[in-house]
Amino acid sequence: MTILRAGRYVFGKNLPNGMYDIFVLSGEGLLTITRHDDEQSWIWLGTKKKAKEYRGIDSEVVKSFTLNGDVEVRIAKAQMIEIED
């Protein structure tokens, strides 16, 4: 299990390229997602009345993300969806 705390995480530098899901373990804080075109999105994460997870952070679209506050998250590779016939 990989746990992340406050900091900036850059795909290809300190985080392998791929698609990831983030799950809040404790605390709360702001997740700032920066795309390759420098557009940003913000999501409040937390255990109380905030988003408890964020799925689908994709390095093909996102160049980095930042966690602020005292939030502690688990990051995991996103699972491939299996489509039934």
Pin down the residues of each PLM region.
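Primarily secretory-pathway and cell-envelope proteins
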Residues: 1, 25-85
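A glycine-anchored, Pro-Gly-centered beta-turn/N-cap motif
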Residues: 5-11, 16-19
